[in-house]
């Protein structure tokens, strides 16, 4: 098959966190079997954080992705051309047809390029890697259309509104969430296939848009790259890794720093915490300047040494949809994990078997203290975690699932098209 992978980001490098990691590995696995064409928007801030110089980083990305893809082209994002571009776009979205999440990637350059690609290549499947790209569906007149939901955007936005304390922000998030819900209800049934990361997100999507055809392609992890080892553990050390530009990550670390850490320090002398991730909030940085045991590392090119040395991985995320790839990374590295249940949504973990759940600050403290005082129990959790990652979430396994779903999507599309053609005769 000829598959167009239309992406809201450049899926490189493979060591990137979150959705970037998922997209890279799925493109690579799909390209083992089918011909992949990549059309990707450039999020310059992401490229800069991961690769330093943006232009040089894009050239590296192009050269690498050319190994897998029949054609690669990058697109600019209009709102990134000025310092206040996104702020102005958010303000305009309040009165416009589309919510901000959908307006973000609207571009004449993208429409022109998509039109040219549609005319020059007979795609069997056009895969849209996020809801924000759904307005471009109408351009592609041939082939099946699939839409990937890394999160159910309306659900995530409405959840964010419920926990936001600032009244104006809460109102904005609530309005955005309701408008996204209306958009999802209209747009998602137009696709031949909607791909979610978990059965829970499929339920959420079908609650919004009951007529959709949906299938789960879980997030995965590179179990060769993320594996146990890397040196001895520090017995009282904790770690969290995740891009702190994403509000659920930042909110999780602020919750931990302000509500859990003070109690934990009182009960466990010598405990340390490493927070890994670009763009840490100033409140976290301020705490790190006052407390040498709470270390905010910012962006690091390789998270594995920090995760490997930690005795426990802590993930107090209480918001956000999809599945959290940071949990999968920690599972693959054989780490004992203490996490809020929401952080593990969509992942087949069992509380007490391959992860320990905690919800409130006191629970986090109790679970952490107990595990750090029981090395055998901690190691057992880590072994179970690694086993789960290898058997269910390795990317070669996930890749086969994606290939099967896209092939079936195309077959249904062809069958429906042929039925329609016969009916017109």
Positions of predicted regions on the chain:
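N-terminal subdomain of nucleotide-sugar transferases
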Residues: 1-73, 121
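Conserved nucleotide-sugar donor-binding subdomain of glycosyltransferases
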Residues: 75-135, 139-140, 168-190
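Conserved catalytic-core segment of nucleotide-activated headgroup transferases in glycan assembly
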Residues: 207, 215-309
